[in-house]
């Protein structure tokens, strides 16, 4: 299941593409797989980093320089109260958003996200509207 999510993220991202995981915590299987099997510019964030390779950030009050230039933002099992913040940041930087919720949990966002079944996993995806600059 986790391999399938990582493969999907890799397929959506070319070499050098900036990808940000929000709420990395201690579960690093997906990020480790992405690092091992691709050349994306992967940044891990968490409000309470579990090690030095994770950048401290609170998605509800984000440091936007972390997310600028990101083509894809993803979060694995984020609490419902940050779903809308994830979407706001994705919109602000024009990034694709992937949320892998806990089983049975609803997505709580202002706009509808598409349910994607990929391999042995499922997740919700939102493609931000490109804003003119």
Swiss-Prot record:
Transmembrane segments: none annotated. Gene3D superfamilies: Vaccinia Virus protein VP39. Pfam families: UPF0146 (PF03686). It comes from the Archaea. Belongs to the UPF0146 family. This is UPF0146 protein MTH_1000.
């Amino acid at each position: 299941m986790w391999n399938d999510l990582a493969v999907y993220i890799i397929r959506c991202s070319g070499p050098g593409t900036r990808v940000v995981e929000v709420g990395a915590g201690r579960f690093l299987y997906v990020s480790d797989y992405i690092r091992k099997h691709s050349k994306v510019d992967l940044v891990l964030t968490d409000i309470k980093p579990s090690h030095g390779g994770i950048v401290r950030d609170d998605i509800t009050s984000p440091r936007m320089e972390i997310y600028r230039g990101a083509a894809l933002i993803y979060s694995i099992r984020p609490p419902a109260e940050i779903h809308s913040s994830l979407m706001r940041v994705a919109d602000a930087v024009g990034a694709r958003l992937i949320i892998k919720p806990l089983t049975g949990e609803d997505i709580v966002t202002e706009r509808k996200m598409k349910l994607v079944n990929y391999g042995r996993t499922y997740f919700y995806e939102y493609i931000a509207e490109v804003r003119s600059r």
